[in-house]
Amino acid sequence: MSERNSAVLELLNEDDVSRTIARIAHQIIEKTALDSKDADRVMLLGIPSGGVPLARRLAEKIEEFSGVSVDTGAVDITLYRDDLRNKPHRALQPTSIPAGGIDNTTVILVDDVLFSGRTIRAALDALRDVGRPNYIQLAVLVDRGHRQLPIRADYVGKNLPTARAEDVSVMLAEIDGRDAVTLTREDSEGDS
C-alpha cells in the first residue's frame, strides 16, 4: 500500500497577483470602452468568497487607470448550485446589488478560479432573478480548464492547465492574510 504525500507549489506570488489584477483591469477598460461617454454602466459582481475582494480590487485599479468609478457588489449562488447534495452546506452570503439595479448594464461576474463552470452557471441563474443586464461578462484570476459546461471567461488572469486531481488555491490578503496562487499535487510514495 502506498502512502500519499502532497506537494504544494506556489504558482503566483503577491507581485504576480497584483500585476495580473492590473492586466485584467486594463482589459476591462479596453473591451467595455469605459472611458467613453457612450459606454454602458458597468458593475463588477463578485462571487463569494474569493470573487468579492477581487471585484473590489479590480474596481480600484479601473478607477486608478481610467478615472471611472465602477460599482461593485456580490451575488450569492448558494441556493442556485446544482451540487448541493455533493458538497457541504454553505452559509448563505448576502447578495448586494449596487443602487439602480442591473437592468440595462454590463455586469462583469468576478471569481477567483474557473473550473467546471458550475459556479458561473449558478451565478447566471441568480442574476436572472435580480434583473436583466444588457451584457454579462466573466473575469477570473485563474482558469484551470476541465469545463463541464460550455462557459468561457472574457477576462483571464492566468491559464493554468491542471490535472483534475490537482487543487488550485487562490489566497487573498482580505481572506487569507496574503496573496498567492498555489497548486497542490497528490504524489504517491515511490512515484518518480
UniProtKB/Swiss-Prot annotation:
Molecular function in Gene Ontology: uracil phosphoribosyltransferase activity
Q: Which GO terms describe its biological process?
A: regulation of DNA-templated transcription
What InterPro entries does the annotation carry? PRibTrfase_dom, PRTase-like, PyrR, PyrR_bifunctional
Superkingdom of the organism of origin: Bacteria
Keyword line: Glycosyltransferase, Transcription, Transcription regulation, Transferase
Instruction: Find motif (PRPP-binding) and give its ranges.
Output: 107-119
Which CDD domains does the annotation name?
PRTases_typeI
As its record notes, the protein acts as a catalyst of: UMP + diphosphate = 5-phospho-alpha-D-ribose 1-diphosphate + uracil
* Gene3D superfamilies linked: 3.40.50.2020
User: What's the EC number here?
Assistant: 2.4.2.9
Signal peptide (residue range): none
Does the record bear Transcription in its keywords? yes
Q: Does the keyword Hydrolase apply?
A: no
The UniProt function text for this chain reads:
Regulates the transcription of the pyrimidine nucleotide (pyr) operon in response to exogenous pyrimidines.
Q: Give the record's family classification.
A: Belongs to the purine/pyrimidine phosphoribosyltransferase family. PyrR subfamily.
Tell me the HAMAP family matching this sequence: PyrR
Write the protein's name.
Answer: Bifunctional protein PyrR
Name the gene: pyrR
